């Protein structure tokens, strides 16, 4: 626990210094750019804690095995299915691991490399869209996404790239966004969900179409058994067909506290939608992305597998939530800032012993 506490302190304090030593930049949505040099310090802390971990995280052994199996391929063409009966699952990621095997057979290089890529894209995005910057970075840990990224590392890496690509949703550059999604799908095929998402989130927040989509998800949640029988047919011939039986019989779902954390920012965003739009007209896109995260969270109360989709949407809370410290008078904003830090710290503290197997923390130096 002490490692995580020190890491959080370093990340928060040095992100604050980066903000204080930054300067005005009207090319950014925030109008302010943190100090580019100082950003490297919190980034380094995030990478080191994640990249040097050993047997930490629910999926650690699974990814270690994937790394070893990737080294068994004879060439990259075999990974992508040229001249073989079947393409490797998520061939882009498998090819990356295959290349790493030429450097070392130690899978720790995989964890370190993925940490560098994932957190670099997230920090870059928060530097462009997060204000106050240090609060956005703190929320990466406070919302538990940082610790959850120790599991499902390839999906979090893809989610980080698509998080960075929000600039193309905002600008309406669908060609670049779709290209990034297609390349990302080679690393995790679920990234393809972001193609229809592009068209959904560019609508005005709280519009009839968005309310209609929300009603659809509510219906799927309440009529879950009927919905899941259709969903299983979709999975039947995919690389995820092994989930069929598990989906039909599993009753383990996302807990109510996580749902509350997803819905509260949306409630505030609805109540103060005009104030938010006055600060940044494109905030509707971020609100819609957060809403999709909540809707998938509702489905995840029936089966936790749907929480995997929330990986793509939960990151946008790091952009939305800090806006709430800018919509009231100065004194109220300061109180809200403190409340956000305290509440999200307690949230991550309570989750840590029971979620994602991040405790106890061990490093490669203890193996």
From Swiss-Prot:
Annotated TM spans: 1-21, 37-57, 77-99, 109-123, 133-153, 180-200, 215-235, 252-272, 279-299, 304-324, 334-354
A biological process term (GO) from this entry: polysaccharide biosynthetic process
Pfam family, one: EpsG
Chief location bin: membrane
Record carries keyword Cell membrane: yes
Sorted UniProt keywords: Cell membrane, Exopolysaccharide synthesis, Membrane, Transmembrane, Transmembrane helix
Membrane topology according to the record: Multi-pass membrane protein
GO cellular component: plasma membrane
Localization per record: Cell membrane
InterPro entries in UniProt: EpsG-like
Induction of expression: Repressed by SinR.
Purpose: May be involved in the production of the exopolysaccharide (EPS) component of the extracellular matrix during biofilm formation. EPS is responsible for the adhesion of chains of cells into bundles. Required for biofilm maintenance.
Name of protein: Transmembrane protein EpsG
Organism encoding this protein: Bacillus subtilis (strain 168)
């Amino acid at each position: 626990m002490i490692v995580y506490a020190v890491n959080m302190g370093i990340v928060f304090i040095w992100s604050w210094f980066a903000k204080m030593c930054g300067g005005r930049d009207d090319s950014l949505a925030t109008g302010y750019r943190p100090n580019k040099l100082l950003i490297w310090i919190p980034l380094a802390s995030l990478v080191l804690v994640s990249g040097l971990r050993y047997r930490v995280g629910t999926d650690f052994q699974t990814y270690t095995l994937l790394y070893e199996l990737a080294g068994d391929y004879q060439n990259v063409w075999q990974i992508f299915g040229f001249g073989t009966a079947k393409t490797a699952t998520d061939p882009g990621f498998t090819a990356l691991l295959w290349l790493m095997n030429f450097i070392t057979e130690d899978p720790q290089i995989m964890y370190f490399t993925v940490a560098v890529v994932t957190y670099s894209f997230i920090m870059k995005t928060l530097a462009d869209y997060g204000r106050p910057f240090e609060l956005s970075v703190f929320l990466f840990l406070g919302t538990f996404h940082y610790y959850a990224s120790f599991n499902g590392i390839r999906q979090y890496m893809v989610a980080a790239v698509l998080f960075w690509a929000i600039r193309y949703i905002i600008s309406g550059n669908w060609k670049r966004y779709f290209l990034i999604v297609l390349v990302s799908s080679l690393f995790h095929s679920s990234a393809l969900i972001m193609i229809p998402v592009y068209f959904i989130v560019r609508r005005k927040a709280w519009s009839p179409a968005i309310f209609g989509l929300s009603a659809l998800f509510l219906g799927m949640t309440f009529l879950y058994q009927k919905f899941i029988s259709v969903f299983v047919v979709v999975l039947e011939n995919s690389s995820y067909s092994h989930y069929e039986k598990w989906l039909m019989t599993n009753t383990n779902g996302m807990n109510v506290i996580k749902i509350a954390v997803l819905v509260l920012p949306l409630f505030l965003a609805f109540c103060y939608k005009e104030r938010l739009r006055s600060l940044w007209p494109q905030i509707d896109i971020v609100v819609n992305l957060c809403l999709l995260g909540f809707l998938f969270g509702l489905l995840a109360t029936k089966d936790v597998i749907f929480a995997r989709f929330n990986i793509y949407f939960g990151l946008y809370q790091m952009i939305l939530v800090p806006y709430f410290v800018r919509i009231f008078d100065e004194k109220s904003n300061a109180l809200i800032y403190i409340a956000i830090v305290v509440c999200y710290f307690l949230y991550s503290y309570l989750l840590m012993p029971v979620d994602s197997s991040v405790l106890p923390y061990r490093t490669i130096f203890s193996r």
